Amino acid sequence: MANNASAEKRILINERNRLQNRFYKSSVRTLTKLYLKDLEVYKISRNPSDKEKAKNRLSLVYSLIDKGSKRNVFHKNTAARKKSKLASQLKIA
């Protein structure tokens, strides 16, 4: 339990930041799964429109990863590694 006002404020700020960080991490995971699912559909169908759909999803994932990195949710190297892995998946497909 907090003993003074500044400690109480820190508790509130930490909770706010925890929820914001959780949003970014969860969103990146969710969009990554959707992107990989789009890639699987493209691998099966070989339809150019499916590849475009996957590329659009990739740009959304990139955007969220970059925003999370900017807000210190992800370390910059972690963000770069995630983006690199996703890009290589597209090249393989």
UniProtKB/Swiss-Prot annotation:
Record organism: Trieres chinensis (Marine centric diatom)
Q: What is this protein called in UniProt?
A: Small ribosomal subunit protein bS20c
Q: Tell me the function of this protein.
A: Binds directly to 16S ribosomal RNA.
User: What is the disulfide pattern of this chain?
Assistant: none
Biological process, per Gene Ontology: translation
Cite the NCBIfam families for this sequence.
S20
Where is it localised? Plastid, Chloroplast
Q: Which domain of life is it from?
A: Eukaryota
User: What keywords is this UniProt entry annotated with?
Assistant: Chloroplast, Plastid, Ribonucleoprotein, Ribosomal protein, RNA-binding, rRNA-binding
Which GO cellular component terms are attached? Answer: chloroplast; small ribosomal subunit
Check the record and name the InterPro entries matching this protein: Ribosomal_bS20 (IPR002583), Ribosomal_bS20_sf (IPR036510)
Q: Is the keyword Methyltransferase in the record?
A: no
